A protein has these predicted regions:
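Catalytic-core regions built around general acid/base machinery
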Residues: 1-7
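Asp-based, Mg2+/Mn2+-dependent phosphohydrolase catalytic module
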Residues: 13-129
Length: 129
């Protein structure tokens, strides 16, 4: 995540309360540029307003933001709200696209883990910048 933060603003959009998200992040040694709790936004995922309001608070148009998740429902809702999507496989939490397909065509980015996501997104930036 640190390498991604060198090029992108990395913010969590979570259904957890802000305090629980902060505690979980600290416990796992993860630093974010920000944490947006649906509790604060007044709209919960998968409501499109949660994603749109999150982008708005970051002064972004939805198509300037990307939802990264291991859950199809999160990604589908984010795409309906106008965001880009990145699927990251997480054992025990993800559906099994990598056992069957090289990628799921509906997502903008498909990664086997966060290291691959980092490589794909940083390569994408350097080739398009």
């Amino acid at each position: 995540i640190e390498k991604l933060r060198s090029r992108y603003t990395v913010v969590v959009l979570t259904v957890l309360s802000w305090s629980i998200a902060v505690d979980c992040s600290r416990h796992n040694g993860i630093s974010w540029d920000g944490i947006l709790s649906c509790e604060f936004l007044g709209h919960y995922k998968p409501d499109a307003e949660a994603y749109q309001k999150g982008a708005d608070l970051l002064r972004l148009e939805p198509d300037q933001a990307m939802m990264v998740a291991a859950h199809a429902g999160d990604l589908q809702a984010a795409m309906k709200a106008g965001l880009h999507s990145a699927y990251v496989h997480r054992d025990g939490e993800s559906f099994g696209i990598f056992g069957e397909l090289d990628s799921a065509p509906e997502w903008d980015v498909n990664a086997r883990d966060f290291a691959e996501l980092e490589r794909l997104l940083l390569t994408q930036v350097s080739t398009t910048a």
